Amino acid sequence: MSRRHDLEQRLRKLGEIGEIMRSMKNLALMETRKLSRYLDIQGESVLMIEAAAEDFLLFHPQLAFFTPPAKHALLVIGAERGFCGDFNEELLQALDGSGSPILGVGGKLCSRLEKHPAVAGLFDGPTVGEDVPRTLNRLVPAIRHLQDAQDCQGLTVLHHRSGVEGVVRKPLLPPFTQKPVSSPRHPHLLNLEPGQFFAELVHHYLFAALHEIFYTSLMSENQRRIQHLEGAIQRLEEKNEDLARKSRTLRQEEITEEIEVILLSVEGVVQR
């Protein structure tokens, strides 16, 4: 009886764990649908800024960044939460060992980067799409400080992207490094001095591009989480089935023993 009781307790606990896992999977699935809408909008914003920059640089090519910067920093975007497989491990393996200053984002990733000699800053990451603006409000000033303090004018982002195997390395700063290919039309009528306008444009581009990258990373993270949880739920269900079979077997044995006791009692009464 005690063995079957222990099995039933384990079954109840596993059932509760399974419900939690299914809830986590459903939340991740809902997040991917929301992020899909965000990505469509943000992707259009980035394209519009890039088109405006290309058009502007046709008339002000002296402001463009055609010379690669001497120093680069790395922005590594990992996961704030777990249950996403080797998401963070792949990012750590992608670090090139060049000694470039590293900005890490995501609690789970940052816990692995704490003792890295090149770390220049560690930040909590977003768990849902609505957290991204708050994360960027802390991150962008750190990028600016790194540019001023260590003269790192280049910034490369390491992150995951859905449908792409491995880690994506995206050069983000300096922006607009490709020479314009369009033909000049009419010069812009600006209310700002061209250099000031271009600086503001770069600032807006940095925020827009980082929004898109973070949404992309969150999408990949949640897809990994769904896949990871599906595998865990399947293994849990298999374990449940195995324990349920054992519990039924023990119950059948108990019933058999009870029948034998009853039969022995009946035989004793008859013999008297």
Locations of regions flagged by a protein language model:
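N-terminal assembly/interaction segments in proteins that build large macromolecular machines
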Residues: M1-R272
